């Protein structure tokens, strides 16, 4: 399949709209990090940092250079060039590397682990973002503290409740709102910088190095808070397919990066002048009369950040389903214009329950900060490893990348391992559950395919029998029948049962196999390969549909593009009733887990967009 990159040249008005759209979707997570990151750095559990000028300069320097190296250099300048037909994200990178010889197995495992860690990020981001915004109420009045939890829960319930409606209409406002948010961040930081211009010294990396040399253990633990400033960096890469690399780069360099630098410098200057502001430096930046509007704006910004990661979870899950890493799930489109706007009820329900539990267990953004880092840093390290495999560049460039980016990321990850007992176990638990689910689904599907192959008739033998006289006893139906099937050299079980048990033989038999390509989209003109296996009186046609992992598996639509006379075809699906050969109490947990997922996955009638009135399901019992 040919790779088709999105055109990078577009009218200026179009580029401006894409850049504004990127502000609303891509940068919500990293844009709300100032709400909690610096506060967390000075109140790290078991390692409280004294508020001195040297410590503030050192921490701000660590923050600014972490953003520069990881977000600007790694993601914006380097990793966004590793696209798969314009699409980004860790699974897109894995798809690019699938056929890299001896790296193939490692790449698959790394991609699975990265995807699993991302789900941990998706659970924590809405919780910590909304909590940090509502905690601004305590800056207005300490008596408002009792409202933080109920208000946070109410906001989160609203976020998940509106998911079935989609964000097509309100999504248009996300960009302007986030632009206002970034302008606000910059505007709040500038007066403090003017009042304490010495804070600009922290732009020099020597302050970070000085802190590391003077207090190595404290600096190491501080990295666990510093990483909070780059949460959402992966979104720059993952959402590249929606906006393109150029608008993301423009938004970063022209709006987001300057705003973040100014607000962190401003928070640092404020903390030096007013050490008591370390309790919540983001909200203390605002004049007293503007704190209520700031809390409202911050809450809206965190809602947008939450929506972005939830949408990312839908997108990643759809990729995983199409790549056969997860069972089929119901996917509903919430927009007639935007293909990428989808809603997955099961994913939404699981995320809702998980986020509610996390908020009720941790109850504050400070407590959740300990849980956040491992999910973020684990993904950072995995993307770096996969990127180095992808570029396969000269040794000195690899060494430079490792020194400037690899070593800092490993240190960030190592620092967060010290917080496993304080909450870091949460993303590890989520990732472990997801890996078990994905590996079990792969393992079980392979076993089913092996057992199924033994029951299926070889294609050549079936074609021979069509010419044999005993077929006269079969009832001929002068219509078209379509049989979706997973392989090209055997006959679908539904077709075998149709002929053997139902004594039916259709005038035209179309056997359709979906070939999942490791690209986001396959151009319509390159999707179908058709071969006529048998002519009159019974015509047998084999169709291979090559689809990308973002392409819809809409069989009637794809087959109409090949032959409109197939529009009224009857579809036959093979339904396997799986049983374990061992009694329920003896069967292994893996067997039971796979059988449970297989029984509860979405029906292929819905996945293939078939009309129930034109679909016949033929059952077969299979023992594993």
Curated annotation (Swiss-Prot):
What molecular functions are annotated in GO for this chain? potassium ion transmembrane transporter activity; symporter activity
Q: Report which residue ranges the record marks as coiled coil.
A: none
Localization terms from the record: Cell membrane
GO CC entries: plasma membrane
**Entry's Pfam families?**
K_trans (PF02705), K_trans_C (PF22776)
Q: How does it sit in the membrane?
A: Multi-pass membrane protein
* Keywords, ordered alphabetically: Cell membrane, Ion transport, Membrane, Potassium, Potassium transport, Symport, Transmembrane, Transmembrane helix, Transport
The primary location reported for this protein is membrane
The free-text function statement in the UniProt record for this protein reads: Transport of potassium into the cell. Likely operates as a K(+):H(+) symporter.
Know the name of this protein?
Answer: Probable potassium transport system protein Kup
Q: What is the lineage of its organism?
A: Bacteria, Bacillati, Actinomycetota, Actinomycetes, Mycobacteriales
Q: Give the gene symbol.
A: kup
